[in-house]
Structures are given as structure tokens and as C-alpha cells.
Amino acid sequence: MAGHSKWANIQHRKGKQDKLRSKLFSKLAKEITVAAKMGDPDPEKNPRLRLAVKEAKSNSMPKDVIDRAIKKSQGGDAENYDEIRYEGYGPNGIAIIVEAMTDNRNRTASNVRSYFTKYGGDLGQTGSVSFMFDRKGEILYKPDAGDADTVMMAAIEAGAEDVESDEDGHWIYTADTDLAEVSTALEASLGESEHAKLIWKPQAPTEIDLETATKLMKLIDALEEDDDVQNVTGNFDIPEEVAAQL
């Protein structure tokens, strides 16, 4: 999400992490099950599954829950999920991408459309806003992984495309197809990362004011609380002084 560190701080201030934690494990487990079902159930032989397990561990998901999710993929009773992307505009024309995983397309489409309508947005067609984003891999390291120069050199050597460092951490960006490979290479030089995942990176984030941010948060909250929704991304940036008031 644009304004990554500020976004995390806003979620923390709002107590949103606690509110979503009950749903978080089920969303992570769903991704693990789907990744394992589509490929090899061994994370070492399945890059998508390896990243899903890594994300689950970084969110303190118990090992037995992770193992159960993998095992579920191999059973005959595992649900079939469709991966769908919805695109539209939020308040003040902010572009929004919603990634969902569902066993009922009609239910999910209806729910997502209703959230956009209720909170001042407009759901569009696939492709209506994704051209404003780049599909990238994002790897996050804490500030103590090293200074900006050290992390930059390690990232370049590992094959990354870009690095953004500030007091909250180091965000390393890769081509979407290189994420697993770069993540593995960085572990050898910088140790375990906080997360490594595919994202939609806004090409030109729009800085928003308090009124727009407040409206936008209502839409994003509603979307993220839906069981079928895995990720929500927008092309906005929230200034520090606005973030402090949310």
C-alpha cells in the first residue's frame, strides 16, 4: 500500500490489527491451502507456498495451523477457490484493487459492489485501474537489518530492482517473477525478512486530505473485513499530519 509505514501505523492506532486478527489466520490458511493444491505441498519445491508459509509465520500463525492448511490441500474435501481481481474507484477517484479468493463468485461480486456503492466508490471492469499499478515483489526488513547503503548493496546483488529505506524499515522491490529467488538470496546476506509478498505498487500515488482519508478508510475496512477478500491496494499516500488524525 502506498505510504507503507504510515499505513501500518494507522492500522495500529485504529486497533485494526486486533479487529482483523481473527480473520487474518483464515485468510493466510486459505492462501496456503490454495498454493499447496496448485503446486507441490513441499514449500521448498513450491515458491508460492514458501512465501505463503513465510507470511503466516511472520504473523505468528502456529505451526500446527500451517501444517493443517497444507494437509487440507491434499484431501479430497478441499474447497475449490477462484482467484478474482476487482477494480474500481474509491472516494475522490482513488484507484482501488481488490484481490479475492472465493468459492462463490456471485456472493463475492455482490458484496464487493455493495461496499463500493455504500462508501462513495464505483466498481469498474477488470483493467479499469490496474494500468496505474505495477505488479511487484515486496520484501520488508526492519531498520536493524543494516544501514541504507548495506541493504541497498545486498538488494542489488540479490537481483532486486529498487529499495526504499526510512526510520521504519527497508522496502525492497523486485520483478514479480523474481520475488522468491531474491527473497532467498537476501536471507543469506541479511537474514529473515519481515515479509516477502506480491503487491500492486502505485505508479503515481495521490496525496489525500483528512476528509478523503476518513471516507477511504471506511471502504477499505469494509473490504478487508470480508472473508473472501485477501488484499486491498490503493494509489494513495497519506501525509504524516493527516495520518496522525486518523
UniProtKB/Swiss-Prot annotation:
Subcellular compartments: Cytoplasm
MF GO annotations: DNA binding
One Gene Ontology term, aspect cellular component: cytosol
Cited InterPro entries: Integrase-like_N (IPR017856), TACO1_YebC-like_2nd/3rd_dom (IPR048300), TACO1_YebC_N (IPR049083), Transcrip_reg_TACO1-like (IPR002876), Transcrip_reg_TACO1-like_dom3 (IPR026564), YebC-like (IPR029072)
Start and end residues of each stretch annotated as Disordered: 1-21
HAMAP family, per database record: Transcrip_reg_TACO1
Record-stated family: Belongs to the TACO1 family.
Protein's recorded name: Probable transcriptional regulatory protein Pden_1905
Organism: Paracoccus denitrificans (strain Pd 1222)
